[in-house]
């Protein structure tokens, strides 16, 4: 007999039971556990819904990874599996053989079905398989603990599809018996009120990544924010609100790209990224109030910060340990920046990246920030490009960076004296001014990578390089 014979015999036995419709809960109780995955795959492919229901009731493993088998949602299959679970969760005394703790609808574990399909069955003993299926990401439950259903949600329509609608309805009527767990929730299009109702049905501690995209308005932030306070394991919070037609692509890079690009990075944990919110005015406080854990990064782009919003930046513990602060395309020329200075003082010992880009900060406002900025000794990146400052104000700024020895990249605007009446750089004027600014800087420290003026260079398209002295492109 060949080495593949045991696997083949198990497969044939399961096929025979299915095709001759001999399958009952009693026959399943007598079958070896090795038969179940093969039989389940066979019943799944043959659309034997009654058999699926019975096998769920007798499932001998801690976890049923249905999502990796059901690549395309199929309502009748889901209904059959949930009917099988119905019989179990309603029983006070659970069947002798039942071990199922998790129904996994995530498309993440093809390994289970590959092993038991025979491709690698001989390299994995039943004992090893038992260890594999301990559901490491879910603590072992007691006899009367709720069943857990795992699924990742990506909501691209304003309403749920038929499978999700059925699943959420099924869970709603079994509160206390079933917990819906979603480690990642993405909302692209569902209205705010519907999304809040959906969040109420998800076990909040299970959410680790939450993305809310443009069609959800923040005009009712006070009603949305309390849900955040319940998400004790939340690591990534991404908010992008607005009504413009935009293209976003989520990627994972070792650093956050320039935020003018259409690429948004969700790499860093404990990051709050808010972009293009048309009506966040005086609502930012609601969000910060309910964030219990300190953020590592706070990124705010293409929006308006009212004075009250600016004041709250330094008041909440969630922003007290920032390593990265990016305020981009925010008009600040009439804003009181003393609260921002207070925030910089608070995070001076931890802040490594500071971006105040295209904020139209003017000389009086810049001077308010300088004392706090001079204390940010851990800064490695400082981007002050796109602001409206004079040459003397920039000199003052450079002198205040005396103690910032770790700065590796600095970007500054062309001073107002080098701009024409249209706001364009006059390179003949900028060149000697830039040289004078460099002399001022070298009096207090030696820079590494630094750039004055338009970024990138309008002539050659170059970005900051390793060179300290930049040539004037001809």
Curated annotation (Swiss-Prot):
One of its GO terms (cellular component) is cytoplasm. The lineage of its organism: Eukaryota, Metazoa, Chordata, Craniata, Vertebrata. InterPro entries: LRR_dom_sf (IPR032675), PRAME (IPR026271), PRAME_domain (IPR050694). Belongs to the PRAME family. The keyword Ubl conjugation does not apply. One of its GO terms (biological process) is negative regulation of apoptotic process. It comes from the Eukaryota. This is PRAME family member 33. Keywords: Leucine-rich repeat, Repeat. One of its GO terms (molecular function) is ubiquitin-like ligase-substrate adaptor activity. LRR repeats lie at residues 97-124, 179-203, 204-230, 231-262, 263-291, 292-323, 324-347, 348-375, 376-400. Disulfide bonds: none annotated. It comes from Homo sapiens.
